[in-house]
């Protein structure tokens, strides 16, 4: 059942992990799924990010595997938040993951 049980437990685990991503670093949905022990759950991580209403969870630090941002924040909002933290972007508007990918440490 959505909204409880295993889904909420998974979402809580996602939020706890995302809270550990420091300013200036990013992680992909798939990377977080792998860290949570379920490498095929990248879409579920995305659902958790979209559903997040928990203060203090820096959802803007989670991007797609190719470094692209999501329009869920509104046009340009995620990019502005990341740039304010010093996250570099490529000429085509993607996060330069090589320099800012969070390693989970």
Predicted regions and their residues:
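Nucleic acid-binding interface residues in structured DNA/RNA-binding domains
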Residues: 2-105
